[in-house]
Amino acid sequence: MSVDYVLQTSDLVKEFKGFTAVDNVNLNVKRGDIHALIGPNGAGKTTVFNLLTKFLIPTRGQILFNGEDITQMRSAEIARKGVVRSFQISAVFPHLTVLENVRIALQRKEGNSFHFWKSDKILDKLNGRAMELLESVGLQDYAHTVTVDQPYGRKRALEIATTLALEPELMLLDEPTQGMGHEDVEVVSDLIKKVSKDRTILMVEHNLHVVSKLADQITVLQRGAILTEGDYATVSADPRVKEAYLGVAADEEETA
């Protein structure tokens, strides 16, 4: 039986002047999986995300989504196809309410301009769906509170809600638990697991506890190239991964 891949890259390369940031990466993301992209700082993880969403143009290689070549498509077209990215840096509007932020995302899905100036009555038609999305991430009780007043974990949940508003088939999560305390990490991890139902998630994540808890498949990058792949048990047992993260070869560690 053939494997159903929602996203594939073939010999993906990104070169800057005198530097190769992504080096012949062949990524295969299985439909319905939570797939983690990990590696030490500077490994090329975020650059891969930027290539997938056309924030950067590949030097060489091919990107396939549902078997269709999207390598030359623009960012907006890729998003309309169903590849939607939730950013590492907060992308919500801090001085709008939680509900208003989700309504803005829903307007994007409809292809409209952002009607900040229109009366609530005109935008009320979006409230039902917005509240459904807030309920899906546990924010329904905070719908009418100002976003800037929310703790970091709730802001992250709101970012996920606004991403869900665009109905992604493939959700790209860039460091979803970065900067969080333990309690928020657990809440957001549980939320990612919940929203992964009926969709595929590709995430960049440094927290290996989160990766071990969530990821069906892991790809480890080092210096822009794939070091190894597999489930958490396979990857964590690979001495090259320990060396990449700790800078110490496994045999050196044993004799230390």
Residue ranges and their predicted role:
Residues 2-256:
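Glycine-rich phosphate-binding loops of nucleotide-dependent enzymes
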